[in-house]
Amino acid sequence: MNPCNTLFIFLRRTRWLAFCLLLGSVCAVTAQNITQTLTLNPGWNSVFLEVSPPNPAVGLVFSDPSISSVWEPVVRVTTVSFIQNQNEVPFNRGGWAVYVPTNRPESINNNLFSVRPNHAYLVNVSGTQPVQLTLTGQPSVRQLAFEPDAFTLRGFPVDPASPPTFQQFFASSPAHYNAGSGALQRIYRLKNTSSQWEAVSPGDHLNRNEAYWVYTSGSSSFDGPVSVTPSVGDSLNFGATADEKELTLMNSTAHPLAITISGFGAANLPLAYYAVPTNSLLRSWIPFSGNYTLNVPGGATQRLRFGIQRGQMTNDNFGAVLSVSDGAGSVRYVSVLAQRPAPVVGKSGLARGTHQPLDGGGTGIPVE
C-alpha cells in the first residue's frame, strides 16, 4: 500500500484531519514538479530559472561552495555599455541585486534574498571545475513583460531536442524582429571563457537554461511562437471542487502549428479533454491517453478544456505535469493538481459530496 495512503487512513481514524490534509499535500508534492539541471562553468554564467523551488532562498538554491556571487539586474538597461564587461569590479553594482555567501564580510551588503521562476541571474563560479546544480520545483508558464525600449536579461522555453535559431524564434514578435527589413533586434549572449557579451547572429541557436540581454522595441511579453496560459494562476489547479480548467494556446506565427500536449513522466492520468472525436461531428469528453495533438491556425487562439476524473485518482491528492510542445522549437511544462473533497456527513448519516458524471448533472468529469 502507498505509504502516504497508510498514514492518511491512520491519521483520519485518529481524527487528526487538519494534520492529515497537510500530510497529503506533502505526499503529492513531487508529482507536479520538474527538475532543472544547470551546468555552471568557472567564471561568469548567465542562467534562466524555470522552476519555483520549495525554498527559494538564494543561498540554498546556489549553495555550492564554488559559487562566489549571484546577481540580478534591477534597473532599466538602455545602453550596451552597462552590460559590456562582466569582469569590471564593481560592474554597475548600483543597478543590481547581489548575493554573496554569508561567510564573507561583503555579504553585509546583500540585497538579493530569493530566486523566482522565469527570472535570469548572473552566477560567478570560482575555481577550475564546473558546478552542476539540480533544482526541483513547480514549473511556471507566466509571461513576464520586457522592459520597453530597453534591454532585458531573459531566457526562453527552448526545446533542447530541436533548438530554434534566434530569427526563427522571434520572427513572430514585432518588438524583436522587423519582418520588412529582416532585422533582428540587438541580442547578446555571454561568452563564458572571456566573460564578454557578444552579439548573436540571426542564424545562431538558442539554448535552454541560458539567459540573454534582449532589446525590445516598444512593449512586449513575447516568450515564444505559442503562448500557453492556464485559465487561473500558473497551473491547472482543480483544487477539491473545480471540475474543469482551460488552457489557452495562442499561435503568434503566420502559419499553422501542430501543438502536442503530453503527460510528462507519467501515464494514465485521470484527465479528460473536450474535443471532437474521430468519426464524429460533436464535441465530447475524451479520456486523455497521454498525448493529444491539435492544429492551431496561424494568428489564432484556441482554448482547450480539461476535466478531472476524481474517480480515477489513486490518492486523495493528485499532481502531474503536462508538456506542451509547439513543434517550432519550444516546450513548456504545466503543473496539474487536484484533491478529492472530504465527505460531508448529513443529518441522515449519509456522506455527501460524491461526484457524479458530467452528463448526469453532477460535478465530476468521468467520461465512462
Regions found by a protein language model. Give the residues of each.
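N-terminal exported-region signature
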Residues: 31-226, 302
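Short, solvent-exposed loop/turn segments enriched in Ser/Thr/Gly
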Residues: 115-119, 207-208, 239-247, 302, ...
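Boundary/junction segments of secreted and surface-exposed precursor proteins
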Residues: 28-54, 345-368
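Bacterial N-terminal signal peptides
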Residues: 16-26
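Terminal connector regions
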Residues: 180-190, 300, 311-345
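Bacterial N-terminal signal peptides that target proteins for export
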Residues: 2-18
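Long, low-complexity ectodomains and other extracytoplasmic segments of secretory-pathway proteins
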Residues: 225-256, 264-285, 324-368
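Intrinsically disordered, low-complexity Pro/Gly/Ser/Thr-rich segments with frequent PxxP/GP/PP motifs
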Residues: 271-312
